[in-house]
């Protein structure tokens, strides 16, 4: 966000305690603030499944079990019609869950001087998966500017960006 000269980063997310040495142990309350935007959880809406069609590598599938929690949250937040910009193939609930049971699992290992220190496994969501999340905010002008920035480029969310995790394209629906 700093490369875009976004002046309201603290307003959106709150102050970053780690940026300011004065804020050790939250002692400097004038610099400590909570963000004014609320980002609700991202719910899986559609999942890429291998296509048997020669012209397409994958198709996006969804089901009522994936859509219902999104619709319920939208209703609870007062969002009457959120528009899905893509059409997905509606699958029977059990069939799509079979695909979801087989998410890729990647073994990760921390090496220290060539010696294995810690082996763990991570389940990853395939590229091209579609999620929906909602944002509530207190300032329309700040939100418009923020929204423009997050839709311009890829955004990296969460950890492990150095190994390609968490990169996403955000599109307003």
Protein language model regions, located:
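RNA-binding basic/glycine-rich loop and surface signature characteristic of RAMP-family CRISPR effectors
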Residues: 1-173
């Amino acid at each position: 966000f700093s490369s875009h000269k976004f002046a309201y980063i603290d307003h959106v997310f709150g102050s970053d305690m780690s940026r300011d040495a004065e804020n050790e142990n939250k002692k400097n309350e004038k610099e400590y603030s909570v963000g004014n935007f609320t980002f609700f959880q991202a719910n899986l809406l559609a999942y890429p499944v291998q296509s048997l069609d020669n012209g397409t590598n994958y198709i996006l599938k969804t089901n009522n079990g994936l859509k219902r929690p999104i619709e319920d949250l939208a209703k609870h937040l007062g969002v009457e019609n959120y528009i899905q910009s893509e059409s997905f193939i509606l699958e029977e609930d059990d069939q799509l869950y079979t695909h979801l049971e087989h998410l890729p699992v990647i073994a990760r290992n921390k090496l220290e001087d060539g010696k294995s220190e810690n082996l763990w496994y991570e389940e990853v969501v395939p590229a091209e998966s579609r999620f929906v999340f909602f944002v509530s905010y207190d300032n329309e002008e700040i939100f418009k500017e923020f929204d423009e920035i997050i839709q311009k480029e890829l955004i990296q969310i969460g950890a492990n960006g150095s190994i390609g995790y968490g990169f996403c394209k955000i599109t307003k629906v």
